[in-house]
Amino acid sequence: METIALNNLTIGYHHNCIAAHLQATLSAGTLTCLLGSNGMGKSTLLNTMSGALPPLGGTVDIAGKSIAAYSAKALAKQMSIVLTRPITVQQLCVNELVALGRYPYTDHWGRLTSHDETIVMESLSLVGMQAFSQRKVGTLSDGERQKVMIAKALAQQTPIILLDEPTAFLDFPSKIDMLKLLKHLAH
């Protein structure tokens, strides 16, 4: 079982500390929710845990190894992340965007195998977006784009998925479906 550990982690931007001395251990097979008021550092913590933002102190470890010691490709096989930032690849088709989650597993040229393409379609199916596979990302609603980004994380097939507001932009029935899917995937 993969675990992610925060060891005396201090997060923030440049020299502006948001939270210090964080300690936590999360195991695979668990669904953990981080709650807090707006502006309290939840997204900063997720960005730091993913390696997108360097810690101001301490470490984030996966399976006992600091994420700083992983190559980008090796880390992408351990952890995927869905953030709340707007998607800037409006001209890609949905299946092309989700296929980006498979690139840690592709060859030097980034070619997808038929197995990769199957995983992309299965991931889209899990979030109810398979019928949208050929649509341009720029034509999707905010909720549809959120589902596509979650499908991309699922296609990455990592033991750890970090989700920043995973039900943002989703209508109420889709929120319920997404939470059921996440619970199922965690167990």
Protein language model features and the residues they cover:
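Conserved ABC transporter NBD signature motif
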Residues: 58-66, 75
